[in-house]
C-alpha cells in the first residue's frame, strides 16, 4: 500500500471503498466516474488528506458497484480497515467536461450572484439525494440555502468569470406564497 504526501489542492472524489468481498483483500468500490471501470485510469487514488495512495490492481463490474483489488492489500482484514474510505484524484487528471457539464469541485467556493446582481453567498456543496442535484449556498449570514440545481434556478454557470447566477424561486426562506389561502 503506497503512501506519501500528495497535494490536496483541487482534489476530486472519484470513488468510495465499501465492504470486503471474499478473503483475499478484494473489496466493493463505488465509482463516481462517467465510466465506472475507468476509475483507475486517472492515476493513483489518494485519501482526502493526501497521506495515503492506492493503485487498482484488478476491477470488475458487479451489480451497482465494482469489485476491485488494490496493490498491497492482500487480506480481508486489510480490506475491512479501508471500508468507507473516499478516494480522490487531482482535478487536472480528469478529462475536460462538455458544455453545461461541471465537476462539483469546479463549483465549490464560487460566488453565487442573483440574477439582479446581488451577492447571495458562496457555493458550499452540490448534493444529490436521489431526486436531482441540489446546490448549497452559504450566505454571508444566516442559514445555508438548498436550491435545485436546474436551469431555471441556476441559469448561468460562468467558470471563466468564476461565478454562478441564481434565480431565486418565488417561495423561499419563509416567503409567503401568493395564494389567498395563505
Swiss-Prot record:
Lineage: superkingdom: Bacteria
Subcellular location: Cytoplasm
Any one Gene Ontology cellular component term annotated for this protein: ribosome
A Pfam family the protein falls into: PRC_RimM
Keywords: Chaperone, Cytoplasm, Ribosome biogenesis, rRNA processing
GO molecular-function term, one example from the UniProt record: ribosome binding
Cytoplasm is among the record's keywords: yes
Any one Gene Ontology BP term: rRNA processing
Residues annotated as domain PRC barrel: 99-176
Transmembrane segments: none
Domains as described in the record: The PRC barrel domain binds ribosomal protein uS19.
Subunit: Binds ribosomal protein uS19.
Purpose of the protein: An accessory protein needed during the final step in the assembly of 30S ribosomal subunit, possibly for assembly of the head region. Essential for efficient processing of 16S rRNA. May be needed both before and after RbfA during the maturation of 16S rRNA. It has affinity for free ribosomal 30S subunits but not for 70S ribosomes.
UniProt cross-references to PANTHER family, sorted A to Z: RIBOSOME MATURATION FACTOR RIMM
Similarity-based family: Belongs to the RimM family.
HAMAP family named in the record: Ribosome_mat_RimM (MF_00014)
Protein name: Ribosome maturation factor RimM
Amino acid at each position: 500500500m503506497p503512501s506519501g504526501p500528495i497535494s490536496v489542492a483541487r482534489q476530486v472524489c472519484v470513488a468510495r471503498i465499501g465492504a470486503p468481498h471474499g478473503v483475499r483483500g478484494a473489496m466493493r468500490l463505488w465509482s463516481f466516474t462517467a465510466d465506472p471501470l475507468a476509475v483507475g485510469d486517472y492515476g493513483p487514488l489518494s485519501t482526502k488528506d493526501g497521506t495515503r495512495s492506492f493503485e487498482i490492481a484488478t476491477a470488475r463490474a458487479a451489480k451497482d458497484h465494482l469489485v476491485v483489488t488494490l496493490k498491497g492489500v492482500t487480506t480481508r482484514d486489510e480490506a475491512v480497515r479501508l471500508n468507507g474510505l473516499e478516494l480522490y484524484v487531482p482535478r487536472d487528471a480528469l478529462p475536460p467536461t462538455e458544455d453545461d457539464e461541471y465537476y462539483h469541485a469546479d463549483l465549490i467556493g464560487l460566488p453565487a450572484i442573483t440574477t439582479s446582481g446581488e451577492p447571495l453567498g458562496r457555493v458550499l456543496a452540490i448534493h444529490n439525494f436521489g431526486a436531482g442535484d441540489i446546490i448549497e449556498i452559504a450566505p454571508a449570514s444566516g442559514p445555508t440555502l438548498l436550491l435545485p440545481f436546474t436551469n431555471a434556478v441556476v441559469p448561468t454557470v460562468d467558470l471563466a468569470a468564476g461565478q454562478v447566477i441564481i434565480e431565486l424561486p418565488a417561495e423561499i426562506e419563509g416567503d409567503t406564497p401568493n395564494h389567498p389561502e395563505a
